[in-house]
């Protein structure tokens, strides 16, 4: 199923998902450094594998996908299937509501 069929996302619920599933490896704050994973500030509209100062896998660079709702929705279901060879160890979020909530949070948090 695509993002267009996803339930409406709740950014507050997404913030909790980010805190428990993502924050150990990612930050969303402007000017914050990278952790195990890249800083996600400015994520929407950016091409995969292009954040300055982060060492991406060749797979992430070569995928050359632009991050937006549709691509994130597919990626977050199963990162290793979407980008075989990615360094991201996270297995994915199987529930459409969880993905929609996380994307709603990221849209808000990575642009402020």
From Swiss-Prot:
PTM per Swiss-Prot/TrEMBL: Binds 1 heme c group covalently per subunit.
One cellular-component annotation, GO: mitochondrial intermembrane space
Bilayer-crossing regions: none
Compartment(s): Mitochondrion intermembrane space
Modified residues (N-acetylalanine): 1
GO terms, biological process: mitochondrial electron transport, cytochrome c to oxygen; mitochondrial electron transport, ubiquinol to cytochrome c
InterPro entries in UniProt: Cyt_c-like_dom, Cyt_c-like_dom_sf, Cyt_c_1A/1B
Pfam families per UniProt: Cytochrom_C
First-listed, main subcellular location of the protein, grouped into a coarse class: mitochondrion
N6,N6,N6-trimethyllysine carried by residues: 80, 94
UniProt GO MF annotations: electron transfer activity; heme binding; metal ion binding
Family from the record: Belongs to the cytochrome c family.
PANTHER family per the UniProt record, alphabetical: CYTOCHROME C (PTHR11961)
Role summary: Electron carrier protein. The oxidized form of the cytochrome c heme group can accept an electron from the heme group of the cytochrome c1 subunit of cytochrome reductase. Cytochrome c then transfers this electron to the cytochrome oxidase complex, the final protein carrier in the mitochondrial electron-transport chain.
Further information: The tentative assignment of Gln-24 and Glu-69 is based on indirect evidence (electrophoretic mobilities and comparisons with other cytochromes c).
Protein's name according to its UniProt entry: Cytochrome c
């Amino acid at each position: 199923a695509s993002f267009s069929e996803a339930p409406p996302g709740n950014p507050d619920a997404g913030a909790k998902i980010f805190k428990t599933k993502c924050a150990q490896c990612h930050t969303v704050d402007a000017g914050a450094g990278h952790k195990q994973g890249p800083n996600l500030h400015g994520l929407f509209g950016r091409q995969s594998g292009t954040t300055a100062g982060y060492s991406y896998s060749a797979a992430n660079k070569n995928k050359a996908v632009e991050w937006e709702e549709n691509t994130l929705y597919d990626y977050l279901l199963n990162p290793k299937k979407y980008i075989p060879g990615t360094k991201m160890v996270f297995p994915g979020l199987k529930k459409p509501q969880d993905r929609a909530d996380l994307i709603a949070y990221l849209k808000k948090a990575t642009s402020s």
